[in-house]
């Protein structure tokens, strides 16, 4: 699915349910990754932290704020 297929840069995948992602709201860091507005991104990705005012960067799908 979209979460388990997220780019993790070799780190173990951290699977979180969509209801929990929604409940977390804005940026909440977890080991190696970042959750914000329903998105799930790698903070260490080449294009930087996904947790900005728009949620994920344009290269990461973010159902909370950007169309996929």
Curated annotation (Swiss-Prot):
Expressed by the venom duct. Residues 1-21 form a propeptide. GO terms for molecular function: toxin activity. It comes from the Eukaryota. Its main location: secreted. One of its GO terms (cellular component) is extracellular region. Contains 4 disulfide bonds. It is found in: Secreted. Keywords: Disulfide bond, Neurotoxin, Secreted, Toxin. The cysteine framework is XII (C-C-C-C-CC-C-C). This is Conotoxin Cal12.1p3. It comes from Californiconus californicus.
